[in-house]
Swiss-Prot record:
EC number(s) on file: 3.6.5.3
Region (G2): 61-65
tr-type G domain boundaries: 10-205
Reactions catalysed: GTP + H2O = GDP + phosphate + H(+)
GO terms, molecular function: GTP binding; GTPase activity; translation elongation factor activity
UniProt superkingdom: Bacteria
GO annotations of cellular component type: cytoplasm
Protein name as annotated: Elongation factor Tu
Residue span of region G1: 19-26
A Pfam family the protein falls into: GTP_EFTU_D2
Region (G3) residue spans: 82-85
Binding sites annotated in the UniProt record for GTP: 19-26, 82-86, 137-140
Description of how the protein assembles with itself and partners: Monomer.
């Protein structure tokens, strides 16, 4: 069966659902998908089970990897990632967040903000997301007086993490909307959410004119066709026949892109902001991995030692309770990869939670990096600091 061509008729934007485990992120994603399929006959409805589609996830009822769906509103085409809320899987949320232009924060009205609500807000802020919309879910289960308190609490939290004070709140029941797609009263919250997304989220400025770069999120082999690397194009454009380099973790190697697809449709060219699959000539699945980048020839190089400015989270923000010293070895998250690195402090004996400091880091393997790239620092399953590269040393 021939694949259809992706028609670029509306501006494209990447959004995602974030928030605490069990607050209803996947249910909301499914409700949006079902609602859009009713409004737009060409759209395909994805049920909850289709989004949570790995066996382990079905068993535990939690989302582990970020899942992508697509839908259209009157004005835009959205790619939507459903981000995991479960603590062990925050690492996957980081790669999901790295692909988002804006986010929908889910908060259950019957329980209010919880620890992961805060961690996700912090990660969203670190990953450069500028605007969020709050979806106050499970309204049918909550005491109306409690809902008002939760609203105030959530807006305070949103402001605390640097998001605008006029962040909109949409209230409803994602489960109600998913279960009763033909009831206008039940789906009113989804309609309102989509309208708010169209009006409130600014279309991102895409770096189309810069040299091509995509951070690999996943690698598949397709029998008879070769190896496909998927991820979001961070900058530039990519066309079939273009020569590229695979950089980081291993030796840099050249290859040619023989196909570009998005949501199983063929693209004439992939542009900054698109979530694409690239078919690569002569590359074996075992030769490339998540965390490498595919880039225009000679535009990015792998490094392992750099100077960075970091902010250490306080205990209240979910960070460390104690200071750290030179020789500290946490995980550094860049784009879609995490690498262990050793911290050296210059002219400072220790770093306390809440400090802003400059450090030197030496990673155990080289990864593709540029000046000004942001990263998260994690240890023992939690984010302890966030930072930005000031200078590449070697």
């Amino acid at each position: 069966m021939a694949k259809e061509i992706f028609q670029r008729t509306k501006p494209h934007m990447n959004v995602g659902t974030i928030g605490h485990v069990d607050h209803g992120k996947t249910t909301l994603t499914a409700a949006i998908s079902i609602y859009c399929s009713k409004v737009n006959k060409d759209a395909k409805a994805l049920k909850y089970e289709d989004i949570d589609n790995a066996p382990e996830e079905k068993a535990r009822g939690i989302t582990i990897n970020a899942r992508h769906i697509e839908y259209e509103t009157a004005n835009r085409h959205y790619a939507h990632v459903d981000c995991p809320g479960h603590a062990d899987y925050i690492k996957n949320m980081i790669t999901g967040a790295a692909q988002m232009d804006a986010a929908i924060l889910l908060v259950a009205a019957d329980s209010g903000a919880e620890p992961q609500t805060k961690e996700h807000l912090l990660l969203a802020q670190r990953m450069g997301i500028k605007k969020i919309i709050v979806f106050l879910n499970k309204l049918d289960l909550a005491d109306p007086e409690l809902v008002e308190l939760v609203e105030v609490e959530v807006l305070e939290l949103v402001e605390k993490y640097g998001f605008p004070s006029d962040t909109p709140i949409v209230k409803g029941s994602a489960f109600g909307a998913m279960s009763n797609p033909d009831d206008p009263e039940a789906t009113k919250c989804i309609k309102e959410l989509l309208e708010t997304m169209d009006n409130y989220f600014d279309l991102p400025e895409r770096d189309i004119d810069k040299p091509f770069l995509l951070a690999i999120e996943d690698v598949f082999s397709i029998s008879g066709r070769g190896t496909v690397a998927t991820g979001r194009i961070e900058r530039g454009v990519i066309k079939v026949g273009q020569e590229v380099e695979i950089v980081g973790i291993r030796e840099t190697r050249k290859t040619t892109v023989t196909g570009v697809e998005m949501f199983q449709k063929i693209l004439e060219q992939g542009e900054a902001g698109d979530n694409v699959g690239l078919l690569l000539r002569g590359v074996d699945k075992k030769d490339i991995e998540r965390g490498q980048v595919i880039a225009a020839l000679g535009t990015i190089t792998p490094h392992k030692k750099f100077k960075a400015s970091i902010y250490c989270l306080t205990k209240e923000e979910g960070g460390r309770h104690k200071p750290f010293f030179s020789g500290y070895r946490p995980q550094f998250f860049f784009r879609t990869t995490d690498v262990t690195g050793m911290v050296s402090l210059e002219g400072k004996e220790m770093v306390m939670p809440g400090d802003n400091v400059d450090i030197v880091v030496e990673l155990i393997s080289s990864i593709a990096m540029d000046k000004n790239v942001e990263f998260a620092v994690r240890e023992g399953g939690r984010t302890v600091a966030s930072g930005r590269i000031l200078e590449i040393l070697e």
